[in-house]
């Protein structure tokens, strides 16, 4: 009897143990990452040919204690290598693990290689050559603490390489994991199986091979025992011949069918090639089709299983499309696949909740470094009077109501950018802004008292409902998370896409960027204030301080301002402002852009202006500003400097976003100024529900 070890992906050990026992293995013992077992020579070859789950089959050769590199060398040399290698066999060493003595795996591999080669030269035998790429024998050494375990890797290449997939092709899951997913899916061979996001077809091919009794090792060309002196070619040929006979019989007797689809024509072509090379191409129908086009291929029965490994995203900007995808799949399953089973394998379990289905079973597994879950569902048969469940019903109804109200109003006003929803319902704490045919959903970060999983699930529901109500493509929804800035610069950089969208606001054309910054380049709540500036600016010299992207300057310029001066500390936003001006034909010396600390520039400037717009941050302690700024504390000092630049009969429009801001009217009077609050006049319909979003004042000489 041979003592053997089969390695596998984490989470599949018990499944592998059952498989090995069914092959005839005895004394199976599960450990993390694999199974120890025993079997005769035939079982060695049976496990190599038939295991769908094992990553490798190892023949342990011995162990040794390693307190020095000499210990490793002598421990390896104690094995009788000369009776293990066929004459002329090449070899390679795979060394893993480190300890205080062996601190580099390459060094460990070199010491093992030296010990093996020296075992031959000491007996005056030809030394075997190393071949790292395609060796006849692979020696595996695993060092754990002070113990080195030495084994012969009888697999050669990993057993997931079945021989049907082009090695250059990208596979999100290995074939061994795919086989486990099939086994755990609840699918019964003989019933239909469908993968609507099949990629290169791995799940379907593994299922078809399982169903037709086709050994996973049947198409492999190389093995790790070809240079092994104890290899029994006669028994191997018997095992191989039996596998070929069973495969022919299984294919001839199988009557059910497999269906695969994907939106990418190139991967579908690869899937067809892979299925043909696996010998089961005639059983699988592959189509180029998006999930949105998915239909039941057998509406009159029999019932089957939908099995898939849908895409998942680690980036925030990919989530809306994935949420929409899962939500859509859930609706299609309920509408078209009543009575079927569904099994999905995912690294993003939160996305699976978008299906709006209750899982019957779930399994955990590792896909490389990723923690994954597989959930199995049974889709209830729909009845004529059953109504589809609505996602986030209260939110959906409110958004639909707001859309009906604001869409018509925005068209009449001549604006393309407006707020559709602003935390109208406390449990759906987001803002939804429309920018032409794009939508930005800003999630207000939930308090720490709210369960993070529940908050994330609610956000997923919001996104799915928003896409559905507005009828937009998922890739035209941008998701952002907004937190209190705590004194940080509000113009935080989020990305580097550099994609700008041209939008219309009354008679102005403006550039917005929906993805790269927390804000988009256009403060929607100041829309009416900008229009007022345009109406007030004819023939006047206009100053815009803390100008951001210069949208107020554009309105003033279009309103007939004699000159405009735009000041901001950020070169990025000044360049953006210049693009906005150029888009509206506002170029030349009459339109100046100045990069400067606005407060420092204000103290030193000696020019005169008829109309000044200033919208400072509530608080700023930017390293590039000379002093920290607090709008409540410092607004009077600001007005003192502004008065010096204000021409007789001129007007300052002052706005800020501080909630509860109190204008120091007595202090203003001492400066010879008076203030008229115009906040209500500057709040448009879409911001009428949030009366504290900003406050706005007209300040003139008393």
Swiss-Prot record:
Reactions catalysed: guanosine(2445) in 23S rRNA + S-adenosyl-L-methionine = N(2)-methylguanosine(2445) in 23S rRNA + S-adenosyl-L-homocysteine + H(+); guanosine(2069) in 23S rRNA + S-adenosyl-L-methionine = N(2)-methylguanosine(2069) in 23S rRNA + S-adenosyl-L-homocysteine + H(+)
Ranges for domain THUMP: 43-154
Lineage: Bacteria, Pseudomonadati, Pseudomonadota, Gammaproteobacteria, Enterobacterales
Gene label: rlmL
GO terms of biological process kind: rRNA base methylation; rRNA methylation
Annotated spans, RlmK: 398-702
InterPro entries reported in the protein's UniProt record: 23SrRNA_methyltr_KL (IPR017244), DNA_methylase_N6_adenine_CS (IPR002052), RlmKL-like_Mtase (IPR000241), RlmKL-like_Mtase_CS (IPR053943), RlmL_1st (IPR054170), SAM-dep_methyl-trfase (IPR019614), SAM-dependent_MTases_sf (IPR029063), THUMP_dom (IPR004114)
Notes on the domains: Consists of a N-terminal RlmL domain and a C-terminal RlmK domain, linked by a highly flexible loop.
Leader peptide range in chain numbering: none
Name assigned to this protein: Ribosomal RNA large subunit methyltransferase K/L
Broad class of where this protein is predominantly found: cytoplasm
Subunit-structure text: Monomer.
UniProt effect for mutating residue 597 to A: Does not affect methyltransferase activity
Regulation of catalytic or functional activity: The N-terminal RlmL activity is enhanced by the C-terminal RlmK activity.
């Amino acid at each position: 009897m041979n003592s053997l070890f089969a390695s596998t992906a984490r989470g599949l050990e018990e499944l592998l143990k059952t498989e090995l026992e069914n092959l005839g293995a005895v004394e199976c013992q599960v450990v993390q990452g694999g199974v120890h077992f025993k079997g005769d020579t035939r079982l060695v070859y049976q496990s190599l040919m038939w295991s769908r789950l094992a990553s490798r089959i190892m023949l342990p050769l011995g162990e040794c204690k390693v307190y020095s590199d000499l210990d490793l060398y002598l421990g390896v040399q104690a094995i009788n290598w000369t009776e293990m290698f066929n004459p002329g066999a090449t070899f390679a060493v795979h060394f893993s693990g480190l300890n205080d003595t062996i601190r580099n795996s390459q060094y460990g591999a070199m010491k093992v290689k030296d010990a093996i080669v020296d075992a031959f030269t000491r007996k005056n035998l030809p030394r075997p050559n190393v071949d790292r790429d395609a060796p006849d024998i692979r020696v595996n050494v695993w060092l754990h603490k002070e113990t080195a375990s030495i084994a012969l890797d009888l697999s050669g290449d990993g057993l997931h390489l079945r021989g049907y997939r082009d090695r250059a092709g990208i596979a999100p899951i290995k074939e061994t994991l795919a086989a486990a997913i099939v086994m755990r899916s609840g699918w019964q061979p003989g019933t239909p199986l469908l993968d609507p996001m099949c990629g290169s077809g791995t799940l379907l091919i593994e299922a078809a091979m399982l169903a037709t009794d086709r050994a996973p090792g049947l198409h492999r060309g190389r093995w790790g025992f070809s240079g092994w002196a104890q290899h029994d070619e006669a028994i191997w040929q018997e095992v191989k011949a039996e596998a070929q006979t069973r495969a022919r019989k299984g294919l001839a007797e199988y009557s059910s069918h497999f269906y695969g689809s994907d939106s990418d024509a190139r991967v579908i072509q690869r899937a067809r090639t892979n299925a043909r090379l696996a010998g089961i191409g005639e059983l699988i129908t592959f189509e180029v089709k998006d999930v949105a086009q998915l239909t039941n291929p057998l509406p009159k029965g029999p019932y089957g299983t939908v099995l898939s490994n849908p895409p998942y995203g680690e980036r925030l900007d990919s989530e809306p499309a994935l949420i929409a995808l899962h939500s859509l799949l859930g609706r299609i399953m309920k509408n078209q696949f009543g009575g079927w089973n569904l099994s999905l394998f995912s690294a993003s379990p939160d996305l699976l909740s978008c299906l709006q289905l209750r899982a019957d079973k779930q399994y955990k597994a590792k896909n490389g470094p990723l923690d994954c879950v597989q959930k199995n569902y049974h889709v209830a048969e729909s009845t004529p009077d059953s109504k589809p469940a609505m996602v986030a019903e209260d939110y959906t109804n409110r958004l639909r109501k707001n859309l009906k109200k604001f869409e018509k109003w925005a068209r009449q006003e001549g604006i393309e950018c407006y707020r559709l929803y602003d935390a109208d319902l406390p449990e759906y704490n987001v803002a939804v802004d429309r920018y032409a045919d794009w939508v930005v959903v800003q999630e207000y970060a939930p308090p720490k008292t709210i369960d993070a999983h529940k908050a994330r699930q609610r956000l997923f529901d919001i996104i799915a409902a928003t896409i559905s109500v507005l009828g937009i493509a998922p890739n035209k929804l941008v998701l952002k998370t907004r937190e209190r800035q705590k004194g940080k610069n509000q113009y935080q950089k989020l990305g580097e896409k550099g994609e700008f969208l041209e939008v219309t606001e009354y008679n102005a054309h403006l550039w917005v960027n929906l993805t790269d910054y927390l804000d988009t380049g256009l403060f929607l709540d100041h829309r009416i204030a900008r229009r007022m500036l345009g109406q007030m600016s004819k023939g006047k010299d206009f100053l815009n301080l803390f100008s951001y992207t210069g949208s107020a300057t554009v309105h003033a310029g279009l309103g007939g301002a004699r000159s405009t001066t735009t000041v901001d500390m950020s070169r990025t936003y000044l360049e953006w402002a210049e693009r906005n001006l150029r888009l509206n034909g506002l170029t030349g010396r009459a339109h100046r852009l100045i990069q400067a600390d606005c407060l420092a520039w204000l103290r030193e400037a000696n020019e005169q202006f008829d109309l000044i717009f200033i919208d400072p941050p509530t608080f700023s302690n930017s390293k590039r500003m000379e002093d920290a700024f607090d709008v409540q504390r410092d607004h009077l000092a600001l007005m003192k400097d502004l008065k010096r630049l204000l021409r007789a009969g001129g007007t300052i429009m002052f706005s800020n976003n501080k909630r509860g801001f109190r204008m120091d009217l007595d202090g203003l009077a001492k400066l010879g100024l008076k203030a008229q609050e115009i906040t209500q006049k500057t709040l448009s319909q879409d911001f009428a529900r949030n009366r504290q979003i900003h406050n706005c004042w007209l300040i003139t000489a008393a």
